[in-house]
Every structure is written in structure tokens, then in C-alpha cells.
């Protein structure tokens, strides 16, 4: 579990940016345009055997009849994907941030300085009046405590889902 926690610490700022980007994409969602959909359908090749099942033999006519339905489906699928990804990421960040905030003592203060204040190790040394080895020890202690919180959280989720 500590590998997962270390990965979250390492990727925290990137995850925050991705969550904000997804939030804005959802807020400003316009989907693909009619022209983009028609163009993609015009250049697509059918899969499998070619069997003509309608009286329409002209490809542009066929495209004109089905593009709107396909465009709505593509836009709906993409919007659902963005929303699902945002909700997953937001929940992961919510638990991670609350777990970090719940850490007590020097390990919690050091990790919060790293993550939420964006301080470097040198800045943490100066701000907390501690040496580099102490920063390292406090970080490891925070990771160990977070790993326990994640294990407990996971066990509670499993118990809830199985009940």
C-alpha cells in the first residue's frame, strides 16, 4: 500500500491539474460538431463484409441520414466518460487530502507543507527548523500512517460492499 501512497504523493499536483481540466471540460462541453462527425463518417471504412442492406447506394446520402444520431451518441459517450473520470479522480483526491489533513504531529505538518504548500525539502528544513534526514524520516512516517489509513478505508469499503 505504501507504493500507492508514494505514487499519490508524487502525482498529487498532476492529479489536481487533471481534475481542474476535466471540471472545465465538463462545464464547457460542446461535443463534436456536425461537420466533424460527417467528415469522420465520410472517411471511415466499414468493418467486416460489405453487404448492402438499404436502398441507399450513395454514401453521402447514407451519411446524411445517420450522422446526427451517431453524433449524439458519440457526444453522450464522451461526456459520460469525462464525468465518470472526474468523479473517480475527485473522490480519490478527496480521500487523499482528508487523510493527509488527519495526520497528527510533525509527520503531518511536513507532508502538508510538501503537498498543500508546495514547499521543497530545503524550504521545509528552513520552515520547520529540521534537518534533511528528519524531513526524510517524517515523510516516511507520514507515508506509513497514510498506508494504514488506506488499508482501513479499503477494508471498510469491502465490508460495506459485502454486507
Residue ranges, per PLM feature:
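N-terminal interaction/assembly modules
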Residues: 1-99, 151-163
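A generic structural signal for ordered secondary structure
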Residues: 23, 109, 135-136
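A short hydrophobic/aromatic micro-motif that marks alpha-helical segments and, especially, helix-coil
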Residues: 31, 119-121, 146
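N-terminal positioning helix adjacent to the helix-turn-helix/winged-helix DNA-binding module
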Residues: 92, 103-107, 138
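Short amphipathic alpha helix immediately N-terminal
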Residues: 102-119
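Helix-turn-helix DNA-binding module
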Residues: 118-134
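DNA-recognition helix of helix-turn-helix
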Residues: 129-149
Amino acid at each position: 500500500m505504501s507504493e500507492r501512497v508514494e505514487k499519490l504523493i508524487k502525482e498529487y499536483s498532476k492529479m489536481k491539474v487533471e481534475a481542474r481540466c476535466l471540471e472545465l471540460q465538463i462545464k464547457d462541453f460542446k461535443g463534436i460538431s456536425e461537420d466533424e462527425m460527417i467528415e469522420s463518417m465520410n472517411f471511415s471504412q466499414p468493418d467486416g463484409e460489405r453487404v448492402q442492406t438499404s436502398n441507399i447506394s450513395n454514401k453521402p446520402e447514407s451519411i446524411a441520414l445517420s450522422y446526427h444520431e451517431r453524433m449524439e451518441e458519440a457526444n453522450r459517450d464522451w461526456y459520460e466518460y469525462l464525468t465518470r473520470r472526474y468523479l473517480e479522480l475527485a473522490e480519490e483526491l478527496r480521500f487523499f487530502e482528508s487523510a493527509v489533513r488527519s495526520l497528527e504531529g510533525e509527520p503531518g505538518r511536513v507532508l502538508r507543507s510538501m503537498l498543500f504548500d508546495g514547499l521543497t525539502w530545503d524550504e521545509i528544513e528552513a520552515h520547520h527548523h529540521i534537518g534533511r534526514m528528519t524531513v526524510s524520516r517524517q515523510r516516511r512516517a507520514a507515508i506509513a500512517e497514510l498506508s494504514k489509513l488506506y488499508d482501513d478505508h479499503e477494508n471498510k469499503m469491502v465490508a460495506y460492499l459485502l454486507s
